[in-house]
């Protein structure tokens, strides 16, 4: 993901997996900075590690940076399951675009 910026919706989704007793690997796409990506992957990783330091120390969460590769893949259903979560209304309403606007108005 882009994680631009980290917000309560991200935390909610991660908590869903942790509550199922599963560990979480957060993959940050290595994208160039832009208006919609105002933070570098290194800045995002540092922020996530600060926000999740307790879970990282317990080895429940790992944060990595991956190359930004876009491709079309066939046979996507092979080897993994798609699990859908339905966030509560307060989480569903979160807009990273609006959060970025507020951050950069300061």
Predicted features, each with a name:
Residues 1-106:
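Nucleotidyltransferase catalytic core that binds NTPs
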């Amino acid at each position: 993901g882009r994680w631009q910026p980290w917000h309560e919706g991200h935390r909610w989704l991660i908590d869903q997996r942790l509550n199922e007793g599963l560990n979480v690997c957060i993959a940050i796409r290595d994208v160039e900075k832009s208006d919609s990506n105002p933070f570098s992957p290194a800045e995002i990783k540092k922020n996530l590690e600060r926000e999740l330091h307790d879970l990282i120390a317990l080895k429940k969460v790992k944060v990595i940076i991956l190359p930004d590769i876009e491709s079309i893949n066939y046979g996507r259903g092979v080897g993994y399951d798609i699990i859908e979560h339905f966030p509560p209304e307060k989480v569903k309403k979160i807009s990273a675009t609006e959060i970025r606007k507020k951050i950069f108005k300061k």
